[in-house]
């Protein structure tokens, strides 16, 4: 049966920004000659080496050099890396095509000492000689999970194309970053990092060429490790990759269990496990772009307290800077001593402090960060070797080249000196796609020109004239020496929302260290900055977990940073779609992620902000943030919003031990903190498109109101017992293991329905105003019994901040043989074993030797 996303209601009417692709966008290159095996297929230690050459068509040139120079000789290397992961690399024999760097600034490839034998792998690689095609088959049920049969293989220097068959109406998830339904249907997803508000279906800040499919209750996944721009077309019966460079470097994943959560473990085994946040990072955050002065920031902090709405972290946007230059202070509105004093007061009050830093550095010879960077020669270059100078908030700017040998030393000094002086607890790195407000090196020869009018302040005619001039200058600059590719205007034009590739970013002809064109490395820029910034903070304080939040990301970014979904809008569809956006990043291995609560652009309303605070309080990263052009939206401004915020944030704080335990599991295993229902219950066909509810872990179900004017919500419940979090009453008893039960739940304006799964034990605390105060209270256990009268749960405890944890406890609880069925709370007296006395309903602590969580276990709770 056809499945329709819950997300879209009049999206195009609201945003006016749905792309219209042509039939050619969706078509495959049917005239391409393809390839055939040429020579001996050789078995290797890892698997297979297959030499290919272009199929001969005599004198016919049809399908040759269509979008670039056709590469005649290519190879296929098949590597059985683990029992659940298969690596298939299709590359040019001459090894001239650009690969993602094997480094923390790209993709750290696994160092495999012993490959598995094909017979022990859960994935089978099958191929056809002429025309060459291949299949990847999951062995346990003989399901073909990737199939290129009768699909063209195109391998040109600036165009790669490969397609796989998928079932009609397949359940595909992932491929981003894009604002779209969680389940991907008939559309084109473009991967080219771009500074732009979250337009539906258009490419935005990051690039994640990874998808998961759930088919017949089992999950598998595929990653294309390629940082070039690409279109990924999902259409009926097919997924097609159209890539403008590099190689086809695929990783396929098929966990033996078939469980989507085990697929997340397998994927993050490759790209890296998500970073572990400190306690304070799990609290409520507040920010605004456009606070006029520090008095206003301090007033917001005070009014949160007066309204008794918990506030853990105060953020300051670029407003604090002098002329929006990094590492400076507005002497009038945000003087340095007041900014330092704000941090000191926050820390005294048990709160935290984060500020923004952008990568673009003002090109001004009186500005020390620019002078030092110029002396160290760390800037991205033009094709002629001069510094590339774009335009961002402070006017004409240079951009650090993260791949330059001096870049780490340069950034370390700037970051460490600044953080040490200001006393902030973390950094927010924005505009790192990288963003530029002009086309090309528009500031060449204009160092010391100072602030420039922003492009949107010009009339349309003036903007067009400026663009014409910039484009003429960019073309005149030409390609880097020896470069034969068309870097500015490749013949295959991906569906970049900005138009040409160099629009509003660093020009594709600009050069990074080693003469690498930006064309080849663009999608890695924010990812590289994330790693270097994290390492700078570790160098500053090497015992404390660093905090970095990034806008642009790539597979593996979650090891270093968290992510917010960027400049969304204060419209109901964006509230609704925030769930899908966050679920995507859970799947991408960035578990510390969230959206701007109440919306960033445009004016929110009391009802919208109230409903957004209710679900936003449970985002893995939870922050209210809005734009300087929008009206105020602090949650204390409306009575209903304040009441809903107090309830929701206090409920989150009550659950902080549960959240923290989930983040530890994410850091150790790679599981998401938020989880889509279909990933926990893959046998339930009715859940495949549900992106309006979410699970927190496996045990807490959130069913928010996401539509204007509604005071109830239709919620889907999988099999089992589901208890109301607030009343402890049994809400749903679903005896089916394949069919959901849909229930209409009352949800007045200040209420978000929350349910706990029967069979779960949730560790909790008594909520206080700050995270520190909350964690200082005794632990409680909230127990919801299943139909057998049993329940289990887990609690992870450490000091809440150490980078290298030297002492931690892992507790696993199990309650059994208790009747009648019900809902109970159990008191935990920390550090003692007598709380497990039979008086507390025969609760038993299970320390299962050899279990996965046991790896972090160092303190035996049974010891005196």
UniProtKB/Swiss-Prot annotation:
GO BP terms in the entry: carbohydrate metabolic process
Coiled-coil stretches: none
Gene Ontology terms, MF aspect: alpha-1,4-glucosidase activity; carbohydrate binding
Sugar-modified residues: 187, 364, 406, 466, 500, 568, 734
EC number(s) reported in the record: 3.2.1.20
Pfam families tied to this protein: Gal_mutarotas_2, Glyco_hydro_31_2nd, Glyco_hydro_31_3rd
Reaction(s) the record says it catalyses: Hydrolysis of terminal, non-reducing (1->4)-linked alpha-D-glucose residues with release of alpha-D-glucose
InterPro entries: Gal_mutarotase_sf_dom, Glyco_hydro_31_AS, Glyco_hydro_31_C, Glyco_hydro_31_CS, Glyco_hydro_31_N_dom, Glyco_hydro_31_TIM, Glyco_hydro_b, Glycoside_hydrolase_SF
Signal peptide extent: 1-22
Active-site residue list: 430 (nucleophile), 433, 567 (proton donor)
Source organism superkingdom: Eukaryota
Keywords: Glycoprotein, Glycosidase, Hydrolase, Signal
PANTHER family: ALPHA-GLUCOSIDASE (PTHR22762), P-TYPE DOMAIN-CONTAINING PROTEIN (PTHR22762:SF133)
Function: Hydrolyzes not only malto-oligosaccharides but also soluble starch.
Family: Belongs to the glycosyl hydrolase 31 family.
UniProt name for this protein: Alpha-glucosidase
């Amino acid at each position: 049966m056809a499945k329709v996303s819950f997300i879209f209601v009049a999206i195009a009417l609201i945003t006016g920004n749905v792309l219209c692709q042509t039939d050619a966008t969706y078509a495959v290159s049917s005239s391409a000659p393809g390839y055939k095996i040429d020579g001996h297929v050789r078995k290797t230690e890892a698997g297979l080496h297959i030499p290919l050459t272009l199929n001969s068509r005599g004198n016919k040139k049809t399908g040759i050099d269509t979008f670039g120079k056709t590469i005649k000789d290519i190879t296929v290397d098949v590597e059985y890396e683990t029992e659940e992961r298969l690596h298939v690399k299709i590359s040019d024999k001459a090894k001239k095509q650009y690969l993602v760097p094997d480094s923390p600034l790209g993709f750290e490839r696994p160092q495999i000492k012993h490959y598995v034998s094909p017979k022990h792998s859960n994935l089978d690689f099958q191929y056809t000689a002429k025309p060459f095609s291949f299949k990847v088959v999951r062995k346990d049920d003989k399901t073909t999970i990737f199939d290129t049969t009768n699909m063209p293989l195109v391998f040109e220097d600036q165009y790669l194309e490969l397609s796989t068959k998928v079932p009609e109406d397949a359940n595909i998830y992932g491929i981003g970053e894009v604002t779209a339904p969680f389940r991907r249907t008939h559309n084109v997803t473009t991967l080219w990092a771009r500074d732009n508000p979250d337009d539906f279906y258009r490419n935005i800040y990051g690039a994640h060429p990874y998808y998961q499919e759930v088919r017949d209750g089992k999950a598998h996944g595929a990653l294309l490790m390629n940082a070039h721009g690409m279109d990924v077309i999902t259409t009926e019966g097919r997924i097609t990759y159209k890539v403008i460079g590099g190689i086809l470097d695929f990783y396929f994943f098929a966990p033996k269990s078939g469980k989507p959560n085990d697929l997340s473990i397998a994927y993050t085994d490759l790209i890296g496990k998500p970073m572990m946040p400190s306690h304070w990072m799990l609290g409520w955050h507040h920010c605004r772009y456009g606070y006029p002065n520090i008095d206003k920031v301090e007033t917001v902090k005070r009014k949160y307290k007066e309204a008794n709405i918990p506030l853990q972290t105060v953020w300051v946007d670029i407003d604090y800077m002098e002329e929006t230059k990094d590492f400076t202070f507005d002497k009038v509105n945000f003087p340095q001593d007041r900014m330092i004093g704000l941090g000191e007061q926050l820390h005294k009050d048990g709160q935290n402090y984060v500020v923004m830093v952008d990568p673009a550095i003002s090109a001004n010879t009186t500005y020390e960060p620019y002078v030092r960077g110029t002396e160290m020669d760390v800037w991205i270059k033009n094709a002629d070797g001069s510094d590339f100078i774009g335009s961002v908030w402070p006017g004409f700017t240079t951009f650090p080249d993260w791949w330059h040998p001096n870049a780490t030393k340069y950034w370390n000094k700037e970051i460490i000196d600044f953080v040490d002086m200001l006393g902030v607890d973390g950094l927010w790195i924005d505009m790192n796609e990288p963003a530029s407000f002009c086309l090309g090196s528009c500031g060449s020869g204009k160092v010391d020109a100072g602030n420039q009018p922003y492009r949107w302040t010009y009339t349309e005619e003036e903007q067009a004239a400026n663009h014409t001039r910039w484009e003429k200058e960019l073309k005149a600059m030409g390609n880097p020496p020896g470069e034969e590719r068309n870097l500015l205007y490749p013949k295959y034009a991906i569906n970049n929302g900005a138009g040409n590739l160099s629009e509003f970013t660093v020009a594709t002809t600009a050069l990074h260290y080693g003469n690498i064109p930006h064309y080849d490395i663009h999608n890695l820029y924010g990812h590289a900055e994330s790693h270097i910034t994290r390492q700078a903070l570790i160098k500053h304080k090497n015992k404390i977990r660093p905090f970095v939040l990034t806008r642009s990301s790539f597979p593996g970014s979650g090891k270093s940073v968290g992510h917010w979904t960027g400049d969304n809008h204060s419209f109901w569809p964006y509230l609704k779609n925030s769930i899908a956006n966050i679920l995507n990043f859970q799947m991408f291995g960035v578990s510390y992620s969230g959206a701007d609560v109440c919306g960033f652009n445009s004016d929110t309303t009391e009802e919208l902000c109230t409903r957004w605070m209710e679900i936003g309080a449970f985002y893995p990263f939870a922050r209210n943030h809005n734009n300087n052009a929008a009206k105020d939206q602090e949650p204390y401004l409306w009575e209903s919003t304040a009441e809903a915020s107090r309830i929701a944030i206090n409920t989150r704080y009550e659950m902080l031990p549960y959240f923290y335990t989930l983040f530890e599991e994410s850091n150790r295993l790679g599981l998401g903190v938020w989880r889509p229902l279909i990933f926990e219950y893959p046998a339930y066909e009715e859940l495949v498109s549900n992106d309006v509810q979410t699970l927190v872990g496996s045990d807490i179900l959130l069913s928010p109101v996401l539509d204007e004017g509604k005071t109830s919500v239709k919620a889907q419940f999988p099999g089992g017992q589901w208890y109301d979090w607030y009343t402890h009453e049994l809400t749903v008893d679903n005896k089916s293991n394949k069919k959901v039960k849909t229930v209409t739940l009352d949800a007045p304006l200040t209420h978000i329905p929350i349910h706990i799964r029967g069979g779960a034990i949730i560790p909790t605390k008594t909520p206080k105003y700050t995270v520190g105060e909350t964690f200082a209270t005794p632990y409680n256990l909230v127990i919801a019994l299943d139909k057998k009268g049993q329940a289990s749960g887990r609690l992870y405890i450490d000091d809440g901040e150490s980078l290298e944890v030297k002492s931690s406890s892992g507790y696993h609880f199990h309650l059994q043989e208790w009747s009648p069925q019900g809902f109970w709370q159990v008191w935990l007296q920390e550090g003692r074993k007598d709380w497990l006395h039979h008086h507390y309903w025969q609760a038993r602590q299970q320390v299962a030797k050899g279990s996965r969580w046991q790896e972090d276990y160092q303190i035996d709770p049974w010891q005196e």
